[in-house]
Amino acid sequence: MKKVLVINGPNLNLLGIREKNIYGSVSYEDVLKSISRKAQELGFEVEFFQSNHEGEIIDKIHRAYFEKVDAIIINPGAYTHYSYAIHDAIKAVNIPTIEVHISNIHAREEFRHKSVIAPACTGQISGFGIKSYIIALYALKEILD
């Protein structure tokens, strides 16, 4: 069974609480349950990690290599726009990685339009609500099969 690591960055633990008009009203826990169900259907083992701290996210990406993780789905939150360190960590481990965003980052404030992480990733999915994670799972199924 292929193992997928889902990493969520800053403030994503507040899904269902923060800016419901942008991120929806589904709780973080319910998002994880939805991802788990779909991952199981697709034959993936899934592990979740959330941190509001850049260094912890980088450490987790490094550990993914040594733990033989097959793929990563990452929602870097605001780190999307300036974390060259997360970009470099993804490049370093050479694990298929998909960057996801709940909102369409290109339809929001100007500073959110650029991702410095996407160039290190296999692809980017943005703007489909929590379904962005599910779409990423389908993409990984194609990539890993």
From Swiss-Prot:
InterPro entries named in the record: DHquinase_II, DHquinase_II_CS, DHquinase_II_sf
Biochemical pathway: Metabolic intermediate biosynthesis; chorismate biosynthesis; chorismate from D-erythrose 4-phosphate and phosphoenolpyruvate: step 3/7
Substrates-to-products reaction catalysed: 3-dehydroquinate = 3-dehydroshikimate + H2O
Site entry (Transition state stabilizer), positions: 18
NCBIfam families found in the cross-reference section: aroQ (TIGR01088), PRK05395.1-2 (NF003805), PRK05395.1-3 (NF003806), PRK05395.1-4 (NF003807)
Known role: Catalyzes a trans-dehydration via an enolate intermediate.
Protein name per Swiss-Prot or TrEMBL: 3-dehydroquinate dehydratase
